[in-house]
């Protein structure tokens, strides 16, 4: 009887351990086992994300997702997402990660896990030549606007309120394309966008020929992160190493040249700070 009891206990323990091992699998394991990486990308934010003439997703963020899927040994699935829906798509499990040029704010970090920065943006004023705007200070008392849920929208609206000029106003738009179109059509006098977006928009030929950069915006460098579920530390650690490898292998510089242009790719660290 004792031998049978010991055998029963051993079998139960083995089953318990097996169950614990199975339950210990995390998001990274699940992605690899599924054979697919669902990656959210904002596809109206060239050159980071857009669609080509055949409606295929293209851009820096798209290539970044493809690179990540390749090293994971899975197939990439690009999920077109708006700026406002990046984190909701993640927390509702519609995507596995977000490569949507998402600013690494402390507020967002309450909801989503963030990698070390994989890209960094500087901001400029986008306007039309006939609006006679040559610097950021010229936006005081002007109708301006920006894309909802973006870093630059929050900063610009805050300044409009601080200026407290009765002639000034701020409008929100659902997409980046809507914001740029509003500037192009004269619905607003200016907006603030990344330098990459500004030059890509002017170069595209899709908008009014008077579209131009009206100086730099005095915003801090916008460091952006890959997003993963907040408690999935195994996946977040993997993303951190992946970003580091992209830089060390020269792939980051290669993608920058391909999608943005010649010149040095932005540094991904605050000087004197170890992220």
What are the functions of these language-model segments?
Residues 28, 60-61, 108-118, 212-216, ...:
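A structural signal for short loop-to-beta-strand junctions that line the ligand-binding cleft
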Residues 40-45, 79-84, 93-105, 121, ...:
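Beta->alpha turn/N-cap motifs
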Residues 25-101:
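Extracytoplasmic small-molecule ligand-binding "clamshell" domains
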Residues 65-74, 152-172, 202-207:
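Ligand-binding cleft/hinge of the Venus flytrap
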Residues 70-71, 79-80, 84-98, 111-113, ...:
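Short helices/loops that flank or line small-molecule/ion binding pockets
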Residues 102-110, 155-159, 184, 189-220:
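A ligand-binding cleft/hinge motif common to bilobed small-molecule-binding domains
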Residues 127-144:
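Flexible hinge/capping segments at coil-to-helix
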Residues 119-127, 205-241, 262-275:
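Periplasmic-binding protein-like
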């Amino acid at each position: 009887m004792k031998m049978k009891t010991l055998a029963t206990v051993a079998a139960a323990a083995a089953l318990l351990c097996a169950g614990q091992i199975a339950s210990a699998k995390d998001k990274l394991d699940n992605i690899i086992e599924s054979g697919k990486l669902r990656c959210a990308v904002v596809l109206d934010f060239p050159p980071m994300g857009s669609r080509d003439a055949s409606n295929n997703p293209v851009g820096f963020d798209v290539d970044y997702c493809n690179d990540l899927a390749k090293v994971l040994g899975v197939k990439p699935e690009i999920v077109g997402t708006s700026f406002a829906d990046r984190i909701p798509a993640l927390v509702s499990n519609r995507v596995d990660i977000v490569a949507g040029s998402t600013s690494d704010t402390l507020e967002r970090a309450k909801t989503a896990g963030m990698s070390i920065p994989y890209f960094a943006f500087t901001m400029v004023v986008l306007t039309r030549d006939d609006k006679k705007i040559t610097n950021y200070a010229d936006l005081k008392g002007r109708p301006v606007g920006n894309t909802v849920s973006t870093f630059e929208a929050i900063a610009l609206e805050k300044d409009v309120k601080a200026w407290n000029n009765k002639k000034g106003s701020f409008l929100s738009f659902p997409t980046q394309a809507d914001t740029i179109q509003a500037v192009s059509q004269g619905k607003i006098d200016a907006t603030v966008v990344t330098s990459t977006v500004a030059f890509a928009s002017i170069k595209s030929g899709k908008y009014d020929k008077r579209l131009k950069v009206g100086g730099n915006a005095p915003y801090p460098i916008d460091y952006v992160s890959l997003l993963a579920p907040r408690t999935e530390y195994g996946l977040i650690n993997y993303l951190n190493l992946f970003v580091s490898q992209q830089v060390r292998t020269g792939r980051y510089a290669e993608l920058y040249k391909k999608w943005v242009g010649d010149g040095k790719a932005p540094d991904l660290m605050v000087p004197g700070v170890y992220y």
